[in-house]
């Protein structure tokens, strides 16, 4: 059965300021019971707090996160910390592990992206022996075409053991229909990120650039898309959620990459209310 949860990175500042235990408590008070852990330091203390929070608030960890190789000095990765990452997954009780993004140096080279996919596939096979499934989270760059093929499809071809965590906002930003991509990868998608796609109106300040700085106006005009709580934008979210469920998704995870100065917990409450109002309340 599909469950609805939340992506920890949405409230990453809270994890740093009040710790995992109190952050899980606040998420639970909204109504979220499943949390995908990402951008949270996996220190022994934090892992212990997560375990305790899950027990005290009847919550669960939907998935953990890992890089294939370090993207910055000191970052844990499957390359350098395989045993610890496996141990952390088992400690918090999840069998799902996800790669958050394509490393930056792989984004400008098809050859390097293919090397990454093959390396991820080897780790997917190795993790499978530990009872853990590995997934890859997309952004818009996976919809660059190489000889007519999306990079996402090329990654899939070179990493058959790697599942996908499809992000409906980033699929839309990449120029594709999220419903179609969810349908295309049915059976390969057990994690889905839900966030809305909001186009913001121009401001009077933006219009003022018409008289003083045309380049600044064009920059403002071309960059109107923002992340938004569910129901606040233009994505066909009900169709996305229904197709994700039909495609075998285990967790629909609410995420908002930025709250633009607003309280992210209030943003998550807006998304929670939209999901309940649209018939998904029994999935929490």
Predicted region positions:
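Acidic/histidine-rich catalytic cores of soluble enzymes
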Residues: 127-228, 234
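N-terminal pre-domain/capping segments
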Residues: 1-95, 132, 163, 273-284
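Active-site acidic/histidine proton-transfer and metal-coordination neighborhood
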Residues: 74-164, 173, 184, 265-266
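Acidic-and-aromatic substrate-binding clefts and catalytic sites of carbohydrate-active enzymes
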Residues: 12-18, 34-48, 68-80, 104-108, ...
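C-terminal/domain-terminus segments
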Residues: 251-279
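Residues that line or immediately flank small-molecule/substrate-binding pockets and catalytic motifs
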Residues: 8, 39, 68, 101, ...
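Conserved beta-strand positions in the central sheet of alpha/beta enzyme cores
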Residues: 36, 63, 98, 135, ...
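A short, acidic, amphipathic alpha-helical segment used as a generic capping/interface helix at domain edges
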Residues: 232-245
């Amino acid at each position: 059965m599909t469950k609805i949860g939340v992506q920890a990175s949405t409230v990453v500042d809270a994890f740093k300021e009040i710790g995992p235990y109190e952050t899980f408590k606040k998420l639970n008070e909204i109504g979220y019971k499943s949390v995908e852990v990402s951008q949270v330091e996996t220190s022994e203390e934090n892992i212990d707090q997560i375990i305790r929070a899950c027990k005290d608030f009847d919550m669960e960890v939907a998935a953990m996160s890992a890089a294939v190789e370090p993207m910055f000095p000191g970052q844990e990765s499957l390359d350098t910390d395989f045993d610890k990452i496996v141990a952390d997954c088992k400690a918090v009780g999840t069998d799902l592990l996800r790669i958050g993004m394509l490393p930056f140096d792989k984004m400008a080279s098809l050859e390097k992206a293919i090397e990454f996919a093959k390396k991820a596939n080897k780790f997917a096979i190795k993790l499978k022996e530990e009872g853990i499934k590995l997934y890859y989270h997309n952004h818009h760059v996976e919809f660059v075409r190489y000889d007519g093929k999306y990079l996402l499809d090329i990654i899939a071809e070179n990493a058959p053991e790697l599942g996908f965590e499809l992000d409906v906002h980033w699929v839309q930003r990449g120029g594709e229909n999220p419903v179609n991509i969810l349908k295309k990868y049915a059976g390969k998608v057990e994690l889905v990120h839900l966030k809305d796609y909001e186009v913001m109106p121009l401001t009077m300040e933006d219009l003022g650039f018409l008289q003083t700085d045309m380049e600044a106006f064009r920059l403002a005009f071309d960059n109107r898309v923002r992340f938004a709580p569910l129901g606040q934008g233009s994505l066909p979210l009900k169709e996305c959620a229904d197709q994700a469920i039909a495609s075998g998704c285990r967790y629909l995870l609410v995420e908002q990459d930025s709250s633009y100065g607003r309280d992210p917990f209030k943003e998550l409450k807006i998304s929670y209310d939209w999901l309940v109002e649209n018939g998904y309340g029994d999935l929490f």
